[in-house]
A protein has these predicted regions:
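Short, surface-exposed secondary-structure boundary micro-motifs
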Residues: 29-31
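Short alpha-helix capping/helix-loop boundary micro-motifs
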Residues: 9-16
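Short, Lys/Arg- and Gly-enriched loop/turn segments at beta-strand edges
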Residues: 33-46
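Loop/turn positions that initiate beta-strands
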Residues: 23-26
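Acidic, low-complexity, intrinsically disordered interaction modules
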Residues: 49-64
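Short, compact, well-ordered microdomains
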Residues: 60-86
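Short, basic/aromatic beta-hairpin or loop at an interaction surface
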Residues: 1-7
Length: 86
């Protein structure tokens, strides 16, 4: 094994452009919901800059500190991709 660390990448929707940049260190707040399909989680980049989609419990983040690795701009929103240590 080469000692590489496993990372999870989460997509966040950011409705106001320019709040984050590639390379920014971010903290996320974890929230959970009980649904008919089971427990799901979603994450908000603090302080309310962007929000993730629903994440199944099996894919729950193990750390709440990450780094922005990519931002994709669309006409309606920006999509922020952040990686977190698994």
């Amino acid at each position: 094994m080469n000692g590489a660390k496993k990372m999870s990448v989460i997509e966040f929707k950011m409705e106001r452009p320019g709040l984050l940049s590639v390379g920014d260190e971010v903290s996320v707040e974890e929230s959970k919901l009980q649904t008919l399909q089971g427990l799901i989680y979603y994450y908000t980049i603090y302080p309310a800059l962007a929000m993730s989609n629903n994440i199944p419990a099996r894919n729950r983040l193990k750390t709440l500190e990450g780094k922005v690795i990519e931002i994709k701009e669309t006409e309606s929103a920006s999509f922020v991709y952040a990686e977190f240590l698994d």
